[in-house]
Amino acid sequence: MTTDSTTYDAIVVGSGISGGWAAKELTEKGLRVLLLERGRNVEHIKDYVNATKGPWEYLHRGRRTVSMEEKYQVLRRDLLNETNLAYWVNEQDSPYTETKRYDWFRAYQVGGRSLVWGRQSYRWSDFDFTANARDGIAVDWPIRYEELAPWYDHVERHAGISGSREGLAQLPDGQFQPPMALNCGEELVAERLKKGFGGNRRLIIGRTANATRALEGRTACQYRDACWLGCIFGGYFSTQSSTLPAAMKTGRLTLKPWSIVTEILYDKEQRKASGVRVIDAVTEQTIDYSAKIVFVCASALNSAWLLMRSATDVWPEGLGSSSGELGHNVMDHHFRVGAAGRIEGLEDKAIEGRRPNGIYVPRYRNLFGDKRSYLRGFGYQGGAGRSDWSRAVAELGIGAAAKEEAATPGAWRFGATAFGETLPNHANHIALDHTRKDKWGLPVLKMDCALGENERLMRKDMANDMAEMLEHCGLKDISTYDAEYFPGAGIHEMGTARMGRDPKTSVLNAHNQVWDAKNVFVTDGACMTSSACQNPSLTYMAITARAADFAVAELKRGNL
């Protein structure tokens, strides 16, 4: 084991959305920061090796193979294909245990999942931050929308969020770039939807981290809809396109990939962290790094893993475990349920371009006097389009008629899937599995999570409501679906180290400090006290920027 002689002002663990923001904010405020990433380096532009490839340029035309399915037993459940396989974790090196099925899609590299995320970016409202207190569920959030609003402003301006201003109380407007346009099928549904349901159900363009105007070092989105390959234009927000260049520009950032942080070092006399211990993923050498503050941004489950691994005789269950809530209250957004139908009257219309964005129907259930048999609610994401030539292949036709059928655009269809809020539940938890180790001899995580009765009741409305809306809008051949969903599949894992007002019932305080060690901050999905139904990444960004501002101020005051 070796010890690095440098004492940094801050160490940031993880380089995804939250870690990138922590590095940017801390360095720009004058701190010398060490950014540790357990996976490989991915250089912006240079390493997006498939960004301009067509399907014909892949050995398997971009599709999955039997050998891929054998190697990627988790990824095969949904996301497996040839085009961006390099961005996903090696499952043999980094396994996990499922007491109950949990679909954990991980991306261990500089940038993390910011390279492959869906980019939908929505603010939460006070309906969300007051929900637990209002419903008597779990614990109250220690912050409110008013406290986070200026930080939403801050991160939206830098990230480049495009969207429309709608004046909706449940979905606050932000500092938007010009919105992308709805297509004619979506406009038809949006206009007809306004005239029904008391005006409470709205269809808007998605709010997405695809820039519609150029930003520093970034070109506006080119409408290629190939974001998951990495964008050589910097058209969407990622660590590589946005926060990492800003942090590097300060000259105060040190980036170390291939650095697996195995524990936070705790000074019992000072009652705070002194640094972290790292295994070099390539050489397997152990190195200790020192810092005045530590930001844990390794993603919700891995951040909890790190806190659990940081056990001492003071905290035998891990740093932050004094409340008994560390590793508990795992949440995700349940989805794969909705409806679709055929639009008539637009046969002379077509779509131009490949807009990398869909529509959004904001939450309306259990709001504005509505009361259901379940708590909370859901929003819809989807879109309208025309089927293409591939629909004709199944007919196996021949001759002129078959050619004409393949050359003619198909019917217009509209479909949407709902994303529903999951309630925090102490029984949904993760733990260290000391009987199973990864490639580096470290214990893996054991998952024990399931949907509850509230989510099951909600899913009925998630399917039927969209069918009802499409019928109101005049669509035909409407069908609903409720496909099998397992926790984790939404890739919005949250909880495990929740914020709260009381150290007896939460892991973090209102500023994301671990109650048990005030110079350790957790600002990724682990900190979330409830899950809302909106995509959470924008809220991670705002929470991280707010916590970094507080941490620097406290450090300067000598309080850390």
Model-derived segments and their meaning:
Residues 59-66, 70-103, 108-109, 118-123, ...:
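Conserved redox-cofactor binding core of oxidoreductases
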Residues 530-548:
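A conserved FAD-binding loop/helix module that cradles the flavin
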Residues 204-211, 220-227, 262-265, 411-422, ...:
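A glycine-rich dinucleotide-binding beta-alpha-beta segment and adjacent secondary-structure elements
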Residues 28, 32, 37-57, 250, ...:
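Glycine-rich loop(s) and the adjacent beta-strand/alpha-helix scaffold that form part
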Residues 44-47, 162-174, 476-485, 557-560:
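Short, glycine/acidic-rich hinge or "gate" loops at secondary-structure transitions
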Residues 85-106, 110-113, 117-118, 123, ...:
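FAD cofactor-binding and catalytic pocket of flavoenzymes
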Residues 2-132, 137, 142, 146, ...:
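N-terminal glycine-rich phosphate/pyrophosphate-binding loop and immediately adjacent elements
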Residues 20, 234, 239, 355, ...:
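Aromatic-residue-lined binding/catalytic grooves and analogous aromatic/hydrophobic interfacial grooves
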